[in-house]
């Protein structure tokens, strides 16, 4: 059994179909990427995964439990595209606030705040107000918050949007450290360089899963030398039924 199973997911908003019969399996411990342009259905898919949206048809199971499940949702860390931080509070106060929301025991809370701040390299900035943080620091603080309750599954929606290349590399280094501890990570991105760092990818276009496999497999099957070229290849109508790589 796969850790995450998505079966025949369909979703529409009015007449606009945003997901069209999406089927995906993700094993435990994998860093899995959802790659596609804006409007391809990536955010809708992750919101269905975490129980924020209910699909019109199909289902998602995580750890063998059908979503939405409150028990499973407590095991998920989610980082949205926009930062939900209290700018007038310090980084430490933000972490403490969310630690209480996650019901982390008081005896463990202080230690966990230090641990997550260290993972994202913000220890030296914990007592500064969030309003003084750079954009990259705010993204890293959001990542720290999503890690507070030690989730089994981390879902990140465009975590490096609007961030300069140097800080993007720093966040990816953080993600690799988190994965090394056994956490399953699902990340959405439209940046090819980031997608290449994932273990496997699902390519989405207009709500349709057009290809799936490792970056190397996708390039090999498409006969191209880059992920961008592979994505363009699989976007052709004649290729969309041939894009699954095991």
Where are these regions (language model features)?
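Helix-to-loop junction immediately C-terminal to a conserved catalytic motif
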Residues: 50
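Conserved ABC transporter NBD signature motif
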Residues: 58-74
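Conserved ABC ATPase "signature" region
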Residues: 96, 100, 107-125
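Catalytic Walker B motif of ABC-type/P-loop ATPase nucleotide-binding domains
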Residues: 154-158
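ABC ATPase "signature
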Residues: 212-213
């Amino acid at each position: 059994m796969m850790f995450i199973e998505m079966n025949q997911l369909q979703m529409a908003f009015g007449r606009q179909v945003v997901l069209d019969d999406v089927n995906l399996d993700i094993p435990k411990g994998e860093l899995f990427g959802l790659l596609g342009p804006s409007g391809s259905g990536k955010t809708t898919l992750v919101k269905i995964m975490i129980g924020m949206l209910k699909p019109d048809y199909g289902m998602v199971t995580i750890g063998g439990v059908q979503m939405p499940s409150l028990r499973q949702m407590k095991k998920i860390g989610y980082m949205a595209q926009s930062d939900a931080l209290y700018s007038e509070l310090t980084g430490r106060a933000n972490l403490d606030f969310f630690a209480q929301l996650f019901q982390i025991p008081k005896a463990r809370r202080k230690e966990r705040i230090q641990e997550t701040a260290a993972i994202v390299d913000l220890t030296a900035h914990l007592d500064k107000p969030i309003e003084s943080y750079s954009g990259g620091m705010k993204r890293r603080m959001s990542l720290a918050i999503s890690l507070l309750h030690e989730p089994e599954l981390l879902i990140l929606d465009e975590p490096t949007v609007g961030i300069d290349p140097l800080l993007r590399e720093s966040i990816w280094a953080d993600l690799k450290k988190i994965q090394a501890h056994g956490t399953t990570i699902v990340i959405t991105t439209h940046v090819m360089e980031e997608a290449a760092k994932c273990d496997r990818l699902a390519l989405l276009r207009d709500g349709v899963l057009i290809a799936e496999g490792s970056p190397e497999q996708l390039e090999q099957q498409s006969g191209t030398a880059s992920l961008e070229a592979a994505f363009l290849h699989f976007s052709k109508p004649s290729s969309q039924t041939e894009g699954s790589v095991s």
